[in-house]
Each structure stands twice: as C-alpha cells, then as structure tokens.
C-alpha cells in the first residue's frame, strides 16, 4: 500500500527537506532538460513519470521515489494518465 500524501510530506520533513508540496501534471506533460539548485525528491502518488538523467531513463510509478541531486541536468515526461507527486526541495 502506497503512503498517503501527508505521510510522504512527514517523511520528507524528517529527512530535512525545507520546501514540501504536492504537484500534479496532466497527461504527457513534458519538462525539457533543466536543473534545480538543490536536491529534490519526488514521491509518486498517482500515475507515472519518466525521468532522464545523463541519457538514462527510468519510469517511476505510484509508490516509488525519484531523487535528483542538486545541479543535475534532467528531463521528465508524465505518463498517459498524468502524474501526482509530493515534492521535497532542500
């Protein structure tokens, strides 16, 4: 059973993430290569997202977590049902 959103938020807070929020993207939303200045964590609640880092792609589904180190160039493409996720930023 996947954690509920508030449980994800609590988990990220305990890990030291300072800015925590829920985000939702529609079907097939695409974020081209970009960088976050600090580490980010994305805990998938519904749907899926494919994240590409250094030419390697991985799809994350509900119940999974994607961590991106600060300063890392990456892109993201939401699945056909979109994606809802809890984000933590340092």
Residue locations for each model-derived region?
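Short, conserved beta-strand element in jelly-roll/cupin
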Residues: 35-51
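Short acidic-glycine-tyrosine-enriched beta hairpin
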Residues: 54-71
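Conserved short histidine dyad/triad with adjacent acidic residue
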Residues: 18-36, 70-71
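A generic "binding-loop/recognition-motif" signal
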Residues: 27, 37, 56, 72-73, ...
């Amino acid at each position: 059973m996947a954690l509920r959103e508030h449980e994800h938020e609590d988990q990220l807070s305990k890990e030291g993430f300072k800015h925590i929020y829920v985000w939702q993207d529609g079907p097939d939303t695409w974020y081209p290569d970009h960088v976050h200045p600090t580490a980010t964590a994305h805990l998938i609640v519904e749907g899926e997202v494919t994240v590409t880092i250094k030419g390697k792609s991985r799809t994350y589904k509900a119940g999974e977590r994607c961590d991106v180190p600060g300063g890392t160039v990456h892109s993201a493409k939401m699945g056909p049902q979109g994606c809802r996720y809890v984000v933590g930023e340092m």
